[in-house]
Each structure stands twice: as structure tokens, then as C-alpha cells.
Amino acid sequence: MIIKTYFSGVSTIGVLSLATEDYGLFPLSVEKNTLEKMKEVLNIPVTQLNISNSSLIGSLCVGNSNGLLVPNIVTSKEIALIKDFLKENSLDVNLEKLKAKNTAFGNLILTNNKGCIISEELQNFRKVIEDVLGVESGVGNYASLPTVGSNGVATDKGCLVHPLTDELELEWITDVLKVDYVGRGTANRGVTSVGSCILANTKGAVIGGDTSGPELLKIEEALDLID
């Protein structure tokens, strides 16, 4: 299932939230009825919190079924909320505070449950990132941009990336993430940082409400969500 939506009138929903194959984190600002829809479409348990008192969960955090990386600026109360949520849902997820100067991990890491791409800006943390997420990685940029996380969205079936990603980069991403297909596209009527506009797993996707019909078709194809 795929739906289009806004979070409090905002279409860059990937900046504000994080979804994996097994859980989702959403900011306190998301309305309860919207949150229930997220649970239904993505078929995962979800919780609401802020990270470092910020609603930018998707920019600050990155995770998959194996692990969750949060910035060092996260509060002890927020860590406790995440741990309680994981325990309540019997989720065995490695939770790690990464002590990096650049705290926008969601913008700088693209992951699924098979591999991850790490921006060159975080290459010194490659080993700990691999250990927490439980996958092998590739280090590099694509589309001449270091923001490999916000410029892509990946599931265990497919991946959508920035439209200026070249053919060699597409092959590299395909190999690292171990998916059958990587497509290029935009969302929210021309936004190239597709990760900032889309939440997805193999069961469904939630897309920013400004996304056009042609964009939606490319998203469905890349993520293998065509019924």
C-alpha cells in the first residue's frame, strides 16, 4: 500500500520520521490519526518522541531491523523512551549513540537490512556503523553529493535515488544494498532529496503529499510496490 500525506502541513515527511522493516519513530507533532495510518500502511509498531528536543528524527537518526544510530546530543530521557518502546515490542535492536561531530546521520547514511552506504563525511566511523546496523557497507558519495541518506530511500527490495546519479553509481548502490533494482526520481513535485520525502519498507510506503502522479509511478517501480 502507498499513500500520500502531510505531517502538520509539511510534505518532507522523511526529515521528520524514520521507518524500517520492523519499527518506526515519529515526532510528537504528528497527529494520532495520522500515526495510526502509518502503522497500517507500513505494518510496523511506532512510537512518538523528539530527538534532542527536535522533531527532525529522520535527519538525525538512521536504522534498520538490526540497529539504530542516534546522535550524541540525544537526551537520557529520549534514550529511555526508545529502549522502552523496543522492549515493549520485543525488538532486538542495537541502540548506539554515535559520537560524531556531524550529527545528521539520517542524511549521511542509506541503509536497508542487507547493506549500507556511508557518506565520506562519516568514513572514520565505518566499523561501528557496520557493527550496529549488522551489515557490510560501501563508503562514498553519489550524484556529487555527500548526503547519501537524504538523497535516497531503500528497502530490502529496491531503492530510489537522486535523479543525477550516474550509471556506475547505480551499479555500485545496487551491489552494496544487494537489491534487484535502483531507480532515479524525485518526489513532492521536483524535490531531488527523495529520502526527505518518503518513508518505506517492503510492505508499503508513505510519500509526501505534494508528490505528482508520474513521480509516484517511479517510486512504486523502484521500491517494487506495484500491486
Swiss-Prot record:
Protein's name in the database: Translation initiation factor 6
Family, per entry: Belongs to the eIF-6 family.
Keyword Protein biosynthesis part of the UniProt annotation: yes
Entry coiled-coil feature ranges: none
Any one biological process term the GO annotation gives: cytosolic ribosome assembly
Segment forming the signal sequence: none
SMART domains referenced in this protein's UniProt entry, alphabetically: eIF6 (SM00654)
Keywords assigned by UniProt, alphabetized: Initiation factor, Protein biosynthesis
Recorded superkingdom: Archaea
NCBIfam families for the chain: eIF-6, PRK04046.1-3
Keyword Protein biosynthesis set for record: yes
SUPFAM superfamilies: Pentein (SSF55909)
